[in-house]
Structure formats: structure tokens, C-alpha cells
Amino acid sequence: MKKFQAVIKDPVGIHARPASILASEASKFKSELKLVAPSGVEGNIKSIINLMSLGIRHNDNITIKADGADEEEALAAIKACLEKNKVI
């Protein structure tokens, strides 16, 4: 399992648009991908509803975890996606 931590820079947090973009990117990989909220609750990154239900807000510290055969590639792609869309 690989993971990284980040701080949410998007002023609205993780809302419908970034959740949709993340879920779409995550679905390209076989690994299990989880976003861990500051409360410790985990959400499946491949699920838009799961991501939005976490209530991630501006300045929240999050952890992204990947576990599986392509975990390194998946984690790098998710991080790049978050940075490209100015979420982190």
C-alpha cells in the first residue's frame, strides 16, 4: 500500500466537479483507491457520491491511499489530477 497526504486548496473543497474528475481518473486503475478525511472516515475515490459525502473542505488535510497491482501509477495519476485541477 502506498499513500500521500495533501491540503485542499480549492476554496469550495471537494464538490461535484472535482469528485467527478477524480472518480473518472481513478476508474482507470485496478488498485483500490481511498481518500481519508480529517475525521478518519475513508471514501472510495471511484465513487462520486462517496467522495462528496466525506464533506472535504478548504484547508482540510487528506490522505490518499492506493493498494493493488498498479498502486504506484494510480497514486501518481491521482496526485497529478488533483494538482492539475488546483484541488491541492
Curated annotation (Swiss-Prot):
Gene3D superfamilies per the UniProt record, alphabetical: HPr-like
GO CC, any one term: cytoplasm
Biological processes annotated in GO: phosphoenolpyruvate-dependent sugar phosphotransferase system
Record: active site: H15 (pros-phosphohistidine intermediate)
Domain called HPr: residue spans: 1-88
Spans traversing the lipid bilayer: none
Activity modulation: Phosphorylation on Ser-47 inhibits the phosphoryl transfer from enzyme I to HPr.
Localization (cell): Cytoplasm
PROSITE patterns (alphabetical): PTS_HPR_DOM, PTS_HPR_HIS, PTS_HPR_SER
Keywords: Cytoplasm, Phosphoprotein, Phosphotransferase system, Sugar transport, Transcription, Transcription regulation, Transport
InterPro entries: HPr, HPr-like, HPr-like_sf, PTS_HPr_His_P_site, PTS_HPr_Ser_P_site
S-S bridge residues: none
Highest taxon of the lineage: Bacteria
Pfam families the UniProt entry points to: PTS-HPr (PF00381)
Phosphoserine carried by residues: S47
Function: General (non sugar-specific) component of the phosphoenolpyruvate-dependent sugar phosphotransferase system (sugar PTS). This major carbohydrate active-transport system catalyzes the phosphorylation of incoming sugar substrates concomitantly with their translocation across the cell membrane. The phosphoryl group from phosphoenolpyruvate (PEP) is transferred to the phosphoryl carrier protein HPr by enzyme I. Phospho-HPr then transfers it to the PTS EIIA domain. P-Ser-HPr interacts with the catabolite control protein A (CcpA), forming a complex that binds to DNA at the catabolite response elements cre, operator sites preceding a large number of catabolite-regulated genes. Thus, P-Ser-HPr is a corepressor in carbon catabolite repression (CCR), a mechanism that allows bacteria to coordinate and optimize the utilization of available carbon sources. P-Ser-HPr also plays a role in inducer exclusion, in which it probably interacts with several non-PTS permeases and inhibits their transport activity.
Family per record: Belongs to the HPr family.
Protein name: Phosphocarrier protein HPr
Organism: Mycoplasma genitalium (strain ATCC 33530 / DSM 19775 / NCTC 10195 / G37)
